[in-house]
């Protein structure tokens, strides 16, 4: 089953019973790829997006994985860096980080609704290992 981003985790980013039910119902597909999951608070892309940045979020995903495994499926987490699709409203007032500071003129969704997309903060070359580490290890609960 292909990945998607369902935006059903609420402000906490913690997967819920709804996530457990949704993914376990699809476990017979074999390999189930989760929704785009943010690895750190500064990488959140959407309101309601599930994360793996805290112990509570990790526990929520563990419960989802357990349910999928009970149904015979395999779960693979899609780690997603929000980049310029984010908004300061979602990331504690921080400016979204992206490959370049680019005003793409679009709109994004925050907790306050639809808003103009901000110009993101351009990542510096020396910051890339941090991003790669988050995406590669998803050991974000320590951040």
Segments from the language model and where they lie:
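Conserved small/polar residues in nucleotide/adenosyl-binding loops
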Residues: 136-142
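Non-globular sequence segments
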Residues: 80-135
């Amino acid at each position: 089953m292909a990945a998607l981003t369902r935006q059903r985790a609420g402000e906490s980013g913690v997967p819920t019973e709804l996530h457990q039910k949704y993914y376990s119902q699809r476990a017979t597909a074999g390999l189930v790829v989760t929704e785009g999951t943010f690895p750190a608070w500064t990488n959140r892309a959407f309101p309601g997006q599930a994360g793996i940045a805290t112990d509570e979020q990790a526990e929520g995903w563990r419960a989802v994985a357990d349910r999928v495994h009970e149904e015979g499926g395999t779960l693979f987490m899609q780690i997603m860096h929000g980049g310029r699709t984010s908004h300061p409203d979602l990331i504690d007032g921080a400016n979204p980080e992206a490959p370049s500071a680019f005003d793409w003129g679009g709109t994004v969704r925050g907790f306050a609704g639809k808003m103009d997309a901000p110009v993101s903060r351009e990542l510096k070359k020396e910051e890339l290992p941090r991003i790669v580490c988050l995406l590669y290890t998803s050991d974000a609960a320590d951040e």
